[in-house]
Amino acid sequence: MKIGILTFWQTEDNYGQLLQCYATQTYLQSLGHETFLVRTTNGRNYNPSFKEQCIDKVRTAYRLYRYPWYFTKNAIASGLYLLTHGRFRKHNIDLEFEIFRQKNLHCTKVYTLDELRKNPPLADAFVVGSDQIWNTTDGIYYLSWAKDDVKKVAYAASFGSRHSSNDFCQLISPWLKRFDAVSVREESGITLCKDAGRSDAECVVDPTMLLDAQDYRQIASPRILKDKYMFIYFLGTRTMIDWKQIHQFAKQKHLKIVYVASQGQVDKFEHTHASIQEWLSLIDNAEYVMTNSFHGTVFTLLFGKKFLTYPVCGAAAKMNDRITTLLNPLGLGEHIYNGNINMLELPIDYESVHKQMAERSCKGKNFLNKNI
């Protein structure tokens, strides 16, 4: 079967975004399908209601009032980062991600929504997901443009931090009803689908969990550092980080700190700029991992590391749903950071964890096998 995949793909430094796309394509190809990534623009066609716009403005004003120190600190840090790193670093990261795309993904040209409506790529089925594609309200990712006789499947689609509203549900309801099968990444997504009139949505694992550690080791770089180290990976979403505590822990354990930051995370600390292959290797060979990233947590689990996942704060706090959906069923809820860094030392029965992850992965695979 010829399958077109639609998900986010333009990233310059979001490792999880590109790896979930890679995993979806790789798994479907392992079933014998011919797959390709449909590259698209992100034109929006949803206008929030006056009430939603007012609520958004009030939330923004409140955050500025409640956390002025945070916005001031980040503005200063951003300026210092750009002055000291400049475009050279960013260009290098862009180049490495583009090389990964060219080497590992089969891609179409870039389509606009209008072009997709008039002349879509030929396919027997389209699969949308994963990532927060349904947090955008783009008709593109709801396959509003796809013809009726083409199979439409959503795999582990995420609404991100979006809350249900009548306007939003009315918009997406006719689009969701056209899908042959719908699955979401978070339990909260099932509720939102029900509110939009789709009561049969299932919760499945992120596509990165359709592959195992050995699959990723095949594309990962060899070990980069001889010394023992702890790996830190933070995204720019607001997170309460006690850096003094982190450095004290590393000193006590005689560990180096390797710190990769992406998606707008800026601060005064030294960063390591890693390719996707290097990023995988850095997690795989670390003594400990600390992250506020969902995908950072996924790969930490796959590689069997001691870890802490930092919850995000403020308006983005709803994004923690994906972390709890991932960790709580595995009995790893205590590894969500609560101020005690020594929780890094909690023993983890990875034989049991990997068995449970394999069962959840099997459910995701069965969903795809059944509906494609």
What role is predicted for each listed range?
Residues M1-I372:
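Active-site anion-handling motifs in enzyme catalytic cores
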